């Protein structure tokens, strides 16, 4: 290869990333217009399009590089020089951290995820000590109650870029002050002030004002979800001021925010104070930089390995029929491998399972489906694998592992947030905790269905409980769109003997689902059955599911709230006009 080509390749990769992030910002910048026009289907399409941008631009760069090198193979020294040139381009580059991840992606695409070493890739950042020397403009604006909180909030809401009229701004301000007074106390409120991000965070059918509430005792989140009525008038739906509430809003089971962030690292640092429980990976994920979040997630995993002497073990819970799941006892993630052979009742292919996981990545997860990161050629040190797990790997996934002596390479796996399996949780709790868990499970089913997702296998073992007590679905091999399912009532038995027969007396076609049958396995436990019948009996009726299908087919997009219904101002303080119920 001629000298000088290394720099050209490095520049080509960085220019490719520039193009990708430019398009990322372009799609993001349309969020305000989509919100103002209530174009909810465009919101969903933009979310999918933005996710696809990254891989699309990686592919474009790879094709460019193949043209530049004329398809000739490149030796290791040549690639090291390319990385050296690329590293020299980054010190003055505003998005250096994501540019490093983009370089990694291009390399992996070129070399089919082989030879993934720190020398060739940015496994760790080339500039870990660097922070933001200059920010072109402030990320946030401060508001002080010099003339009282009513004036402060009036200025804050009037300062928003939204061009729609308010339904009743004075009312919303009264509600916010009432909440803050209840939370902080009347004496403390005058000594507090707010810092608000310049950019709104858009997701689903809401525009979130995200801020920091500085009190005499510390800093709290200050989150206002702003909605629009069918008539195009704005209203504030609630005010959230605890770290737990903020953590749920920015949770791993939710779709990525659309927030205009030309300097994503600066925004991540700004968010860290009000989301202290979130890792760097989770913060990048929340603002839509999911590929760099994968890089950060892998770095967090490597750091954990260096600080721990734990061994990988099979994950607790009922063993899956499609996925082999393992973990580290103290790590908050699980590793999931698609088995070489599935249980006989699972009539599907590995390609189908991967397609289901991709569907979840692109779909609105409504706070009820865990996000995943996908890895290829994942290396594990044999010394860190428990012998029982090693035997299980050789038994269940021999075609997906390569033995390199001291290490094994797993051809493909997913990493996902670790949760307590719901079936285990239900065995351990009672009283109000049991009631809350059953309510959460039913709500998860309803919200998934309203978002056009049918879980397929709704057994408790396929759901997990987060640290905030939320129930989240994580077994995706049987999911499908609601509109693909035929919900049927079980026909009346022709004869008494029919109900005792081992085979049904009625025909069953692919895609047929009989909600009445859910009762047999959801209500078998006498502790659970009465609670389920009380709160979610309509889930056993086919007409409930068919009514949801009708709404979906008619184009309705349901509201998705990242907080309890009882927290809405309309429930707490008074009735917001019924026109606020969007269709």
From Swiss-Prot:
This is Isocitrate dehydrogenase kinase/phosphatase. Belongs to the AceK family. Transmembrane segments: none annotated. It catalyses: L-seryl-[isocitrate dehydrogenase] + ATP = O-phospho-L-seryl-[isocitrate dehydrogenase] + ADP + H(+). It is found in: Cytoplasm. HAMAP family: AceK (MF_00747). InterPro entries: AceK_kinase (IPR046855), AceK_regulatory (IPR046854), Isocitrate_DH_AceK (IPR010452). PANTHER family: ISOCITRATE DEHYDROGENASE KINASE_PHOSPHATASE, PTHR39559. Disulfide bonds: none annotated. It comes from Salmonella heidelberg (strain SL476). Bifunctional enzyme which can phosphorylate or dephosphorylate isocitrate dehydrogenase (IDH) on a specific serine residue. This is a regulatory mechanism which enables bacteria to bypass the Krebs cycle via the glyoxylate shunt in response to the source of carbon. When bacteria are grown on glucose, IDH is fully active and unphosphorylated, but when grown on acetate or ethanol, the activity of IDH declines drastically concomitant with its phosphorylation. GO terms for biological process: glucose metabolic process; glyoxylate cycle; tricarboxylic acid cycle. One of its GO terms (cellular component) is cytoplasm. It comes from the Bacteria. Pfam families: AceK_kinase, AceK_regulatory.
